[in-house]
Amino acid sequence: MPRNSITIFTGLALAAVLFITASAASEDLSGYNPTYSMGSEDKDWWTDYPNENPNPGASVDHPSWVLQSLKEKPVIILLHSASCKSCAAQMKTLSQILKTYRKDITYYNIRVDSNDSRGREAFEAYDPTGGSNYVPTTIFLTEFKDTMGKTSLAWHSYEDAMSESDVEAYIKDAIYYYRQSNGGGA
């Protein structure tokens, strides 16, 4: 085989290996049972405002950039400030866990003490207690198909730093529910 052909063949083989490796990087959730269910209690996934909100059961006006992102995969939004110690802890936790799940999640890291209007929009839409604007606030969003086959947007938000196990559970749930609602297996 001529030298140029070997180089091209080697390059194609390497590209195929990289593609297969990247494709296999998605987390396998076959046999996974979600940690949190749909509902209106504190740790549940919500489709409307939860019981702790001043408007329990009211519909959420989801920002357009969130809806656009959810067309691809589940979303995590971290709202934080530069001078917040618990924000730094939450960023570290998310950074560590996203090493495993980054391919399956769209992540927004938004400083609320900047001029990014998405922070205000996210607080308005996803503050579980309505109006406190506490940081850090971590928001998990996914699609969910109910027993009648209707797909809804489900979300959960948490004010303060979270344990690594809770963050990972919400991420895995989000990926699982998203895949189930979009016809894919876990």
Positions of the model-derived regions?
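N-terminal targeting signals for export/organelle localization
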Residues: 1-56, 174-186
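Thiol-based oxidoreductase modules, predominantly thioredoxin-like and allied folds used
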Residues: 60, 79, 103-120
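Typically the conserved alpha-helix immediately C-terminal to a functionally engaged Cys/Sec
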Residues: 65-66, 88-101
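Short active-site neighborhood of thiol/selenol oxidoreductases, capturing the structured segment around
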Residues: 67-82
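Extracellular/periplasmic catalytic domains that process cell-envelope and extracellular macromolecules
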Residues: 69-71, 102, 128-134
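C-type cytochrome heme c attachment motif
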Residues: 81-89, 136-139
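Solvent-exposed loop/turn segments at secondary-structure junctions
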Residues: 81-86, 112-117, 145-147, 160-164
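Non-catalytic, surface beta->alpha helical segment in thiol-disulfide oxidoreductase systems
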Residues: 133-186
